């Protein structure tokens, strides 16, 4: 395998011409582990940073992430480390798969050491206190570093099982897009490019809201017609909100929008779907979260997006109904009722002029 640097990339690299980029994934959850495994399988010099030293040592010995992906064997070349400085020094790309509530703190910690030419967020969420997207946080904490976001319908267990999947790398830098495609693209995992960073990021964050709604609906055994309404009205809400945030609503027609929405809303593998199902089955939020044992970004996103939508005067009835059900004790039937409000609005709203949406 030839030695290779990030800055050597000047054009897309064919799948059969892999060279050894140095990749680090920060965060040992299911998706971070899946992306690290893909990079290692593609021949990249790959590390995964995990806070707990014992867990990192166990992964290096067994090549299994027992907590998140116990049924899959990882590439033997993938190295787990618990030292953050070691993880980020002299690397070409840092992929950050840290929950949104800890994202900024980890970037602050790596700032003195980072020598990477690109930092890419894998996190689908919004920072609670500031309503900042992960790309905003990267720009604030690492202002000199090229950045991007990776998002799409990427259920980790399906990727690990080798099922054909795709994702989107969004960045203002063509070089960052090429580098991430080079590191992760394979015969079974296609990486598309985009320059609409906020659009791709919004799709990844907002769809978590509606996965919670679909999980609640599944617990009530809703029909296919109702599921279709949830999906399409969710897409309308997402596009309305995206326009107010300066994103291109047409981005939501791609993998990072409707693709991710469909996968997350229809899969029992989705954490947000699972927590919704638990809530619909009569459990409290605390009980559901404890039972899941992982972070469900959708719950935090519901709170943040509802507040921002009220501030911006964006009509988001499903999001409002979810908030009322989860935090105010309203009956889950309110979610279904939210689909039937507001008379005869246009079906495909995001193709209308903005003042008509």
From Swiss-Prot:
Binding site for NADPH: 30-31, 51, 124, 156, 271, 297
Positions bound to sn-glycerol 3-phosphate: 124, 152, 207, 260, 270-272
Pfam families, sorted: NAD_Gly3P_dh_C, NAD_Gly3P_dh_N
Any one GO molecular-function label of the UniProt entry: NAD binding
EC code(s) of this entry: 1.1.1.94
Database matches in InterPro entries: 6-PGluconate_DH-like_C_sf, 6PGD_dom2, G3P_DH_NAD-dep, G3P_DH_NAD-dep_C, G3P_DH_NAD-dep_N, NAD(P)-bd_dom_sf
GO term, biological process aspect, one: glycerol-3-phosphate biosynthetic process
Pathways per UniProt: Membrane lipid metabolism; glycerophospholipid metabolism
Region forming the signal peptide: none
UniProt keyword list: Cytoplasm, Lipid biosynthesis, Lipid metabolism, NAD, NADP, Nucleotide-binding, Oxidoreductase, Phospholipid biosynthesis, Phospholipid metabolism
Disulfide bonds: none
PROSITE patterns to which the protein is assigned, alphabetical: NAD_G3PDH
Catalytic activity line of the entry: sn-glycerol 3-phosphate + NAD(+) = dihydroxyacetone phosphate + NADH + H(+); sn-glycerol 3-phosphate + NADP(+) = dihydroxyacetone phosphate + NADPH + H(+)
Cellular component terms (Gene Ontology): cytosol
Active site per the UniProt annotation: 207
Locations listed in the record: Cytoplasm
UniProt similarity note: Belongs to the NAD-dependent glycerol-3-phosphate dehydrogenase family.
Role according to the record: Catalyzes the reduction of the glycolytic intermediate dihydroxyacetone phosphate (DHAP) to sn-glycerol 3-phosphate (G3P), the key precursor for phospholipid synthesis.
Protein name in the entry: Glycerol-3-phosphate dehydrogenase [NAD(P)+]
UniProt organism field: Acinetobacter baumannii (strain SDF)
Lineage: Bacteria, Pseudomonadati, Pseudomonadota, Gammaproteobacteria, Moraxellales
Gene field: gpsA
């Amino acid at each position: 395998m030839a030695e290779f640097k990030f800055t050597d990339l000047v054009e897309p690299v064919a799948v059969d011409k892999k060279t050894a980029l140095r990749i680090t994934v920060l965060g040992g959850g299911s998706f971070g582990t899946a992306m690290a495994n893909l990079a290692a399988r593609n021949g990249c010099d790959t590390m995964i940073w995990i806070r707990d030293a014992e867990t990192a040592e166990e992964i290096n010995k067994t090549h299994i992430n027992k907590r998140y992906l116990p049924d899959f064997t990882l590439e033997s070349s993938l190295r787990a480390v618990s030292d953050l400085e070691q993880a980020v020094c002299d690397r070409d790309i840092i992929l950050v798969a840290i929950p949104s509530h800890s994202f900024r703190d980890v970037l602050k910690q790596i700032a003195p050491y980072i020598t990477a030419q690109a930092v890419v967020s894998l996190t689908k969420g919004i920072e609670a206190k500031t309503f900042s997207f992960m790309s905003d946080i990267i720009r604030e904490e690492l202002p000199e570093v090229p950045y991007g976001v990776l998002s799409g319908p990427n259920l980790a267990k399906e990727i690990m099982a080798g099922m054909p999947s795709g994702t989107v790398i969004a960045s203002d830098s063509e070089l960052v897009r090429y580098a991430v495609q080079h590191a992760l693209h394979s015969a079974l995992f296609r990486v598309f490019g985009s320059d609409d960073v906020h659009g791709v990021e919004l799709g990844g964050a907002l769809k978590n809201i509606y996965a919670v709604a679909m999980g609640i609906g599944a617990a009530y055994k809703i029909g296919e017609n109702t599921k279709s309404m949830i999906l399409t009205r969710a897409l309308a809400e997402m596009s309305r909100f995206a326009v107010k945030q300066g994103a291109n609503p047409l981005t939501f027609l791609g993998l990072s929008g409707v693709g991710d929405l469909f996968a997350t809303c229809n899969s029992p593998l989705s954490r947000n779907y699972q927590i919704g199902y638990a809530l619909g089955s009569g459990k409290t939020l605390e009980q559901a979260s404890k039972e899941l044992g992982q972070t469900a970004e959708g719950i935090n996103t519901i709170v943040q997006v509802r507040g921002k939508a009220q501030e911006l005067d964006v009509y988001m009835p499903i999001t409002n109904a979810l908030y009322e059900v989860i935090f105010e004790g309203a009956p889950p039937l309110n979610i279904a009722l939210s689909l039937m409000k507001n008379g005869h609005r246009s079906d495909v709203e995001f193709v209308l002029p903005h003042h008509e949406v």
